[in-house]
Structures are given as C-alpha cells and as structure tokens.
Swiss-Prot record:
Residues 452-492 are annotated as: Disordered. The gene is y. Belongs to the major royal jelly protein family. It comes from the Eukaryota. It is found in: Secreted. This is Protein yellow. The keyword Transport does not apply. It comes from Drosophila pseudoobscura pseudoobscura. Its main location: secreted. One of its GO terms (cellular component) is extracellular region. Residues 1-30 form the signal peptide. Residues 471-480 have a biased composition (Low complexity).
Amino acid sequence: MHVQDKGGIGALTALSLLLVAVTMVTPTQAAYKLQERYSWNQLDFAFPNARLKEQAMASGDYIPQNALPVGVEHFGNRLFVTVPRWRDGIPATLTYINMDHSVTGSPELIPYPDWRANTAGDCANSITTAYRIKVDECGRLWVLDTGTVGIGNTTTNPCPYAVNVFDLTTNTRIRRYELPAADTNPNTFIANIAVDIGKNCDDAYAYFADELGYGLISYSWELNKSWRFSAHSYFFPDPLRGDFNVAGINFQWGEEGIFGMSLTPIRSDGYRTLYFSPLASHRQFAVSTRILRDETRIEDSYHDFVALDERGPNAHTTSRVMSDDGVELFNLIDQNAVGCWHSSMPYSPQFHGIVDRDDVGLVFPADVKIDENKNVWVLSDRMPVFLLSDLDYSDINFRIYTAPLATLIENTVCDLRNNAYGPPNTVSIPKQVGPGPRPGLSAVGPPLYTNQYRPVLPQKPQTSWGPSPPSRSYLPSLGASPGGPGQVVSSVSVSTNSVGPAGIEVPKAYVFNQHNGLNYETSGPHLFPTLQPTQSQVGGGLKTYVNARQSGWWHHQHQG
C-alpha cells in the first residue's frame, strides 16, 4: 500500500489556491479545521525498559503491526486510546498518553491504570479488550470489557462482558459489573457506550449498543443492575445499506445493527434523548431516556422509539457525540469526513453540515468525542484497510486530531449564531400516551418524525470561502470521483488480495459470546499468566514483571 503524495501548497499561486478552495468546498463544508495532534506509522507501547520490550517482541507478546487504535477520550492531561486484541501481540488494550510529557508526535501508549490491569484473560482483575470508552462529568472513566480475543472466526471468549468504572482522581477501579446472560445472546457484539448523568453522580446510567445481537442494554449505577431492550426493528440493519466503500475498498457489512449513540442535554421533563443509528443504515432513531431507565418498559416501548429522516447518500456512521448545547458531531466513514447537526433543527440533509474532510488523514474516522472544555477529538485508523488488506507501515496510518467545537462548526449550518438559519426550534420526543388509539400511528408501526417546525426555516445560505491557506499541507480532491456521483475515492492505494478480494462478504470484528457454561481457549501469546513468579522466574520478561508487582510501573512513569 502507498499514499499518493498530493504535494505541498507552496507551488500553488494565490490565484490557483483561491480557485481550488472555491471549487472543492461545498456549501455545507468547513475547511481544514481539525489540527493533527498525534500520528503513528504503527503503535508503540511504553514498556518499563528496552529489554522487556525486546523480550515481548521476541516472544510474540508484542507485535507492532497487529495493533489498531479504535477509541479515544480526553480528560485533564491524559488522552485515552483503546487498542482491541483482534490479533495476537497486543500488550495493553486500555492506554493513555501523558499530554504534559508528549505534546505532539508519536508517543508511546501507557497502559492504564497499569500493566496488571491489562492482563488478557484475568477476568476479575483486568481488561481483556476495550473498544470505545466514555469519561463522565463526575470524573469517572467507563470501560466495557468485551472479554474477547481475536476477530471473526478466530475469536475466543476468555471472559464475559463486564462494565469497569475507574476513578480518574485516584486511578483505581471503583466498579466492576458483569452483564448477566439475559442481557446478551449468541451473536452479541458491543462496541459502543453512552453515559447518562441525571440529578447527581449516583443517578447515572450507561447504555450499550449490541451491534450484532440487535439490542440496547441499560445499566443503572445506583441499582447496580442492567436490562435489555431487544424487541425493536430500529436496532436492525437496513438491507439496502450494507454496501460500503472506504479507501478504494468495496466491502459488505450488511449485518451491522445499532452502533453510534449520542445523548442530548437534559430536557424540560428531566430526561435526555438518546439518538442512535445502525451501522448499515443512513437513518437516525431516537428514544427518551425515561423509557430506557425503566426496566418495566423493555417489552412495552415499541411506539416510544422514533424514526428520523435519512442523512443522505454515503452516510454510514459508527460514532456520534452531542455537546451540552445540542450540537451533534458524527463520523461519515464513506466520505472521510466528520459531520454535524444542531438538534434544535429538523433532522434532514438540509441541516447537516461537514465540519472537516480529508481523503488522506481522515480515512475511517473511527471515533469522535467532545471533552469538558468543548474541544473535539477525532481518531482515524484506516480500519477497513487493516482488516481487509495491508497497511503500509512506512506511511502514517493512525492520527488523532483536535479543534475547538466552536471553530469546527463556524460558518456551517450547525452554527446557530448565523441568523440566516432562523431561530432554533425545539424538537422533543413524543410524550407517552395511555391505552387507546395513538395519534399519528398506523397499523404498521410508529410514524416518521413529522413534527411541524415553526417558523418556516429559509433555504440554507451559500457559504463563501476565502483564499486563506488550509491548516494541512495538502488539498485532497473533494469533487466527483470515477466511482460515480457522490462516490468518495480515497487517495490511499491498497492491495486487495492479502485477505480476500474486494467486494466479497468478510467477517468483521464480531464474536459469538456464549461464555456461560462453555470452555474457551485461553492460551496463546496474547495472554499473560496470572500466577506469582517463582524466584527463578524473576527477570524473565514482561509477564514476570507484571505479575511481580501489585501495581505497574505507571505510577513511576506518571510521576516522572
């Protein structure tokens, strides 16, 4: 695989730069606002010393080419990054960057909270595989351990699904909760989480999207209990939206159900609205957290879920987040872009904008987050290339971008400070009604989101872009591509025969989670033994180093 060099902008004259900027940016498109903070050809981990790193590589405990970052979250001076154990050789799945020590560049990932807590297969004490994570306003880090090692047909399940919550002040785990068997099924794959804080930190709920088991799981912090909503067709994929095109690779993820989720600010009734989308879909759905917080509604809530309009073509999304003033950001994986929508506006393509797009740096923007200071963080990882072809490890493959939210949405349809869009309109979930006919419902199910919006909003204005140079040193083409109208063809060139030819159905990172009552393979280079070492084993490598300490070297590294 290679990346085509777009060239610097120094050779462009002022006139040609202006022409490029004007012709390449659509009316809803922002212009190179995300700033690259960190980047890697391949991931590296902060081993205690060089000798242990060499031993880990020699033994297969660390295989750099097998590590792919998928989740990002920011808190204080730490930027958390998750690395699932899809392949052997992943020494830690929950890691962070000390941003005081590494302002930019390609920093080593530090296991969080320490090496021992990242021991695969040590179910009660460690995290085997983490995907997307969430920091709440109470300073807690929520991590769902899927308990899996491997990908597709290679998946094993050393541990059950478990919610892990860490106090980020003390860096200690303060809660571990195993999902009961009733909350999962043989196809369960949970890779996303949303956290809902109510009137105080104890009034907290987490929601988990079961992408391949087609369900939505609620967990109550106060009750330390969970329950599952699984009887809704909105959790399922759209059979017409299972075809994907990313980085020049055509593939089918037609089985991908509910995935991306976001929560609105608390509404006047004291609850939030959860928005969600199946991955194989271009449509968004909504439900009040009043329903999700009520265990008695798991079988009687069909009409409380609401369908919104489609986003438009090439609009698959895996990650979404909403600010406390109602701006939703979401990745657009087919378009190498990050989109936006203001939740006070109708959910229609007219009111969707693109805050940034990059056919090199944003190939598969896997995760999007907004931190407590309203800074946006975006992680891109070229995931389909990693899964279906070969990454070129002489090229930059993984990037983390950041920008203030206000900067990203400025002069887009999501910026309500622009009076041309008219005053905001309140959009709310329909109230629960009692027995009897339900207004607006037909015999076939719930209606589309058809609230009347007043005042009538004018057509989105055209946005003019000046000749100021972009923040990055290349200008990716955003025009029509050879793939047809609206088709995005990335400038990343890949081979397509190392795993399978492009265009065929390929296994994604899903599992068949049947932990209860079954035996699973728990050996291999990806698992560290949990027994204390004998005296003769001291100095025997990373495994021994981890097991010889109650806590890892993280504290020394952090204080250093």
